[in-house]
Swiss-Prot record:
It comes from the Bacteria. Keywords: Isomerase, NAD. It comes from Rhizobium meliloti (strain 1021) (Ensifer meliloti). The lineage of its organism: Bacteria, Pseudomonadati, Pseudomonadota, Alphaproteobacteria, Hyphomicrobiales. This is Probable UDP-glucuronate 4-epimerase. PANTHER family: EPIMERASE-RELATED. Its cofactor is NAD(+). Disruption phenotype: Mutation affects lipopolysaccharide (LPS) production. Its EC number is 5.1.3.6. The gene is lspL.
Amino acid sequence: MRYLITGTAGFIGFHVAKRLIDEGHFVVGFDGMTPYYDVTLKERRHAILQRSNGFKAVTAMLEDRAALDRAAELAEPEVIIHLAAQAGVRYSLENPKAYVDANLVGSWNMLELAKAIAPKHLMLASTSSIYGANEKIPFAEADRADEPMTLYAATKKSMELMAHSYAHLYKVPTTSFRFFTVYGPWGRPDMALFKFVDAIHNGRPIDIYGEGRMSRDFTYIDDLVESIVRLSHVPPSEENRVAPEKATDTLSRHAPFRVVNTGGGQPVELMTFVETVEKAVGRPAIHNMLPMQQGDVPRTFASPDLLEALTGFKPSVSVEEGVARFVEWYDQNYRRAHTTV
């Protein structure tokens, strides 16, 4: 198959593209190479993808509609996987315009592109942050998600709403999948796991917010990629509406549109996560206990029922196994070879 994937120099986009290329598919990757974090890491990811003749890269911003058109002409995609975004809850407090530009204007450009070329399936990356401070657990796709705690979450919810309207108007089958704290090799340096491991190795304290009592539904990257690939083969339609006894389906009554959680439903308390990291690294961390930051939520906890009903799969890699794999990657790429990154 032929895919157009945005954000292929990013953590998740890199892994999704690599999986599809390794399976023999053709992928055009679109990425703006923004300096939100070390661009060298993004360049290294793209360099790996570019070893294959099944990958072509277009470097441009999502706000550049003409560049998106060029990428689509090159890809002739059957499936579009829109992963590029301005990520990060805390950064949205400092630079809100970046979120409006990438997550609203950029996503609107993607919807306009899908309207023009009518792919078999449009897939959009969303986030568990949409659930805000939801007290009902686990978080199900049909739960209220209209009280975002950050601009980042608000832009992602807005993207979902725009996508539903386009799916209704132009009949492009569209799936919005909500991530839950994704981690693993080649992960972002601003994420907790990378920061914790790097700090421990370099003798710096780690900041533990919420006194360590917050919990997160950590999702290992390979599990997420498997979820996305399987969902790509299930474009929303009445033919695959899920029976109520299996899960509450979010398939719209008015459009070929569906929202799906991609978490495994196994939340871990932050202090337990820290202890797991310490064990994998082989030394204790220096703990700097802090209150919750503005915009943080006390917990995330996915219901994987709909994902499993649609694909026969739910994330299962344990935090212990996933953290160990990340530490092994970090040791090979940072601890032993700092000058290469």
